[in-house]
A protein has these predicted regions:
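Conserved C-terminal helix/linker of AAA+ ATPases
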Residues: 300-321
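Post-Walker A helix-loop "phosphate-sensing" segment adjacent to the P-loop in P-loop NTPases
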Residues: 111-121, 152
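A short, basic N-terminal segment
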Residues: 6, 18, 23-87
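Mid-core helix/loop region of P-loop NTP-binding domains shared across ATPases and GTPases
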Residues: 32-48, 88, 123-125, 133-253, ...
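Terminal-proximal interaction/regulatory segments of ATP-powered molecular machines
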Residues: 351-430
């Protein structure tokens, strides 16, 4: 690869010449201080459009949740029996990313229900696990649950069943209702199967003091359709769908946060509307809308302006798309990167439909070139489903008559860029 030499002056800091050996290390600069403390002093003297930026973060707990009154009520109805020490029904919540699922569950369970239980003198325990971040295996799940109820485990020597038993033994030590919230439960099921659900429901029947209810949160609307019949039977779960927000609802959410996040008159007309329109276009994602508004404000601060303009929203969208896709591409397993590289080379850009069979044939050729054993076509199909969920591709199943069904795939515009191609080629050494 050709080495690039760059030199920039940024606010008194000399960024010296450096070779760009690869995309992965091109962000590592050799810095020479001119007057580094002065840079930060000047930064602190500069104004900001923000009053309280953390209000725009996805993990912020607001005072109100607009346009989710129906869903809040339905969750309340399901969990209310816990206040009488009666086991609530298991509940599976579905909806695309950024539709308020986790926020509503935490609002009702960790907020309202726990407060009501304290007033009533009732013992309700709540455990929250993000299955994608904290427990993507059955062993990891029960270890995390055991840790949260205060059970100390040895570092080695325990099987999954041992850890499961240790967790339930500790949880059953007091008379209470235990509500286990499993966020991104579909991610754990894809990696570990659904046996953990069966274990929880069967163990529940053996407990003497504690009764356990499961609340599963999923971005995949169809994941429960693949549950084993015995698991479905033991769960007897209720279901709740969170629909995407529309542009008007997203504007209300943004205005609700912006009044606390930004200084007076620091948002120009049309900024909130533009953020809402962009996010509504992408399945009504409130998290995306909040990120757009936050990044637009950050870009405004960096250029020293006093108000966020509509053009800053366009710049924010471009930055977020680039950063998100780059992270997704570089953190994928090698086999998944080969699948994506195959899609990229067949598609020749966004806007063209291709088929699973085409992708698989080219993928096998790249595996041979990389000295890797190819995955089965079914596993590659699972990877395509993950790409679809991540927004890297859009996919739909179509019928080809007597030839059966196949999947029609289109590469998302933000993934069909020279940067993505370069990242993949460097990661795969192609």
């Amino acid at each position: 690869m050709v080495c690039l030499e760059c030199i920039f002056y940024l606010s008194g800091i000399l960024i010296k010449r450096f070779p760009c050996f690869s995309i992965r290390n091109s962000g590592v600069f050799i810095l020479k201080e001119k007057n580094l403390p002065q840079f930060f002093e000047e930064y602190l003297k500069k104004g900001s459009v923000f009053k309280e930026k953390r209000v725009l973060q996805a993990n912020h707990f607001p005072n109100d949740i607009p346009h989710r009154a129906v869903q809040i009520h339905q969750v309340r109805v399901v969990v209310a029996p816990a206040l009488r020490l009666e086991r609530p029904s298991n509940l599976f919540i579905y909806g695309k990313t950024g539709t308020g699922k986790t926020l509503v569950v935490k609002w009702v369970i960790n907020g309202e229900l726990v407060s009501a239980a304290k007033k009533a003198g009732v013992s309700i325990q709540t455990l929250y696990v993000n299955c994608k971040l904290d427990a993507d295996t059955e062993y990891g799940l029960f270890t995390e649950l055991a840790t949260q109820v205060g059970k100390e485990l040895p570092l080695t020597g325990l099987s999954t069943d041992d850890v499961c038993s240790a967790f339930f033994s500790k949880a059953d030590s007091t008379k209470s209702i235990l509500i286990i919230i499993l966020d991104e439960i579909d991610y754990l099921m894809k990696k570990a199967g659904d046996d953990f659900l069966y274990k929880i429901t069967r163990k529940n029947e053996e407990l003497k003091n504690t009764q356990v209810a499961i609340i599963g949160i999923s971005n995949d609307l169809m994941f429960a359709e693949h549950l084993d019949p015995r698991v479905k039977s033991s769960l007897s779960e209720e279901k709740l769908l969170f629909p995407p927000y529309n542009a008007i609802e997203l504007q209300d959410i943004l205005n609700n946060r912006a009044s606390s996040a930004f200084k007076h008159s620091s948002l120009e007309p049309g900024v909130v509307e533009k953020c809402a329109a962009y996010a509504a276009r992408e399945h009504g994602d409130a998290r995306r809308a909040l990120d757009l508004l936050r990044v637009a404000g950050e870009l405004t601060d960096r250029k020293g302006a006093t108000s966020v303009a509509v053009a800053d929203v366009d710049s924010a969208e471009e930055k977020i798309d680039h950063d998100t896709v780059a992270e997704l591409v570089t953190t994928q397993p090698r086999q998944a990167q080969l699948v994506l590289y195959s899609i990229l080379n067949i598609s020749h850009g966004a806007g063209k439909f291709i088929f699973t069979g085409e992708v698989y044939e080219l993928y096998k050729k790249y595996c041979a070139k990389a000295s890797l054993r190819p995955l089965t076509q079914r596993r590659v199909s699972d990877i395509l489903s993950e790409f679809d969920m991540l927004g890297i591709i859009t996919a739909r199943v179509i019928s080809k008559g007597r030839y059966g069904r196949t999947r029609e795939i289109m590469l998302a515009p933000q993934a069909a860029t020279p940067v993505v191609r370069r990242l993949l080629e460097e990661a795969l050494n192609l």
